[in-house]
């Protein structure tokens, strides 16, 4: 009997092993896919970008950071774009791109877009190039989450400040203002508030490199809500290169504040601006200081400049005229009276704007970024380069139909539902091969199985 019971477990195992072996023979192995290659099928329609920069001495050279497609470069004012990050920068979400003024070969990129939609992807730190984007090295801050701004010392490319918003999905300590003095070999956190409040913006006084302006914001994305604002946020200033900080309060909103963008006027460093999202509607708006930040006053409360403040509400000062400032929101606006009015709307190829970079040698030359990509203007915004040359579309979900050759369908963020062929028609351009299959930016698409 002992031998019988010893044999039974073996029989049972054998009984189950035989069917499993049969099933495993039908499971595709890795070898089957070895000869398959990825093929780009389109579309050439730009996707969301929240990070841009340009090269002062090369007026036709610009950089674009997208929220899902990495870093791109143009050397012909936006007529053609080339990806310069694939295979080196390991995430596609880019929050900041900054080119050194003193050495234009040096570029810093911060990963993780800091305008936190619900479909945002987190970053994995800072990357650096010393050859205009040909090669990239990872230089730290892997847990900094979303990077809102990188500010490079105007005379020394090794001195860099980073506004780290932190993990957008939960609390962490790797957030605040960071500084390096050796080109990214070592980083020091120079201003920190809490594990739920991070830095959204950082600026260097153009006439005093030891004076630093920064904004802090409490924000977190949860599956069911957006946590936006607290009494910890605000505007902070350091006058000794980040060793000591003071919260600026005179004339600014009290209580809860959300996203804040700050800016020095390069033409008059005593003039500062802050676009502030405040809990009290009557306190939010554009604030200005004309005494270096000691006193502030609200000069504009127009809601078109600050709606959905957590997503838009960007400001950029003209490099040579202290009275000109640009505001990016659903529209792109220009003020010529120091921010009191924004009567001029500049029409860009796409709405939902996230900022502008202006060449200080010729302020008619600029690059704007928005939910449709990036576009270049050489005439102050009168006309722009196309966005139909950027394969950076941000799709929510992919569906295919049953025809042969099959077509692919997807809803593009802030664009339309699109249909793309799996096998393009050679006689047609990439633009002609795809078409809008429906409006809105839906995430789920259902295709009839036979029609």
Where are each of the predicted segments found?
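Bacterial Sec-dependent N-terminal signal peptides
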Residues: 1-26
């Amino acid at each position: 009997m002992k031998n019988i019971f010893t044999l039974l477990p073996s029989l049972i195992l054998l009984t189950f092993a035989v069917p499993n072996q049969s099933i495993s023979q039908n499971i595709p192995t890795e070898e089957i896919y070895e000869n398959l290659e990825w093929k780009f099928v389109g579309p050439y329609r730009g996707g969301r970008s929240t990070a841009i920069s340009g090269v002062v001495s090369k007026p036709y050279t610009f950089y674009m950071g997208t929220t899902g497609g990495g870093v791109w470069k143009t050397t012909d004012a936006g007529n053609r774009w080339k990806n310069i990050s694939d295979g080196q920068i390991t995430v596609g979400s880019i929050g900041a791109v900054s080119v050194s003024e003193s050495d234009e070969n040096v570029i810093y990129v911060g990963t993780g877009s800091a305008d936190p939609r619900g479909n945002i992807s987190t970053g994995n730190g800072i990357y650096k190039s010393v050859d205009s984007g040909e090669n990239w090295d990872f230089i730290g801050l892997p847990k900094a989450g979303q990077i809102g701004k990188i500010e490079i010392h105007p005379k020394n490319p090794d001195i860099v400040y980073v506004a780290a918003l932190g993990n957008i999905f939960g609390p962490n300590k790797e957030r605040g203002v960071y500084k390096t003095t050796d080109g990214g070999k070592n980083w020091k956190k120079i201003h920190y508030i809490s594990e739920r409040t991070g830095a959204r913006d950082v600026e260097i006084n153009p006439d005093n490199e030891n004076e630093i302006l920064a904004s802090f914001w409490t924000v977190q994305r949860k599956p069911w809500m957006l946590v936006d604002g607290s009494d910890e946020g605000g505007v902070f200033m350091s006058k000794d290169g980040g060793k000591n900080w003071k919260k600026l309060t005179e004339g600014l909103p009290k209580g809860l504040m959300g996203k804040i963008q700050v800016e020095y006027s390069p033409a008059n460093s005593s003039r500062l601006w802050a676009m502030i999202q405040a809990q009290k509607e009557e306190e939010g708006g554009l604030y200005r200081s004309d005494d270096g930040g000691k006193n502030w006053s609200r000069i504009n409360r127009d809601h078109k400049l600050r709606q959905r403040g957590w997503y838009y509400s960007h400001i950029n000062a003209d490099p040579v005229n202290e009275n000109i400032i640009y505001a990016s929101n659903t529209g792109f606006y220009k003020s010529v009276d120091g921010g009191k009015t924004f009567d001029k709307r500049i029409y860009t190829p796409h709405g939902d704007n996230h900022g502008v970079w202006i060449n200080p040698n010729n302020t008619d030359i600029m690059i704007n970024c928005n939910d449709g990509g990036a576009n270049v203007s050489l005439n102050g915004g009168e006309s722009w380069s196309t966005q139909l040359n950027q394969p950076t579309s941000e799709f929510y979900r992919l569906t295919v139909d049953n025809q042969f050759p099959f077509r692919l369908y997807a809803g593009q963020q802030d664009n339309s539902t699109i249909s793309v062929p799996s096998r393009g028609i050679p006689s047609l351009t990439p633009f002609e091969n795809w078409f809008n299959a429906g409006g809105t930016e839906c995430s789920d698409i259902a295709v009839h199985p036979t029609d």
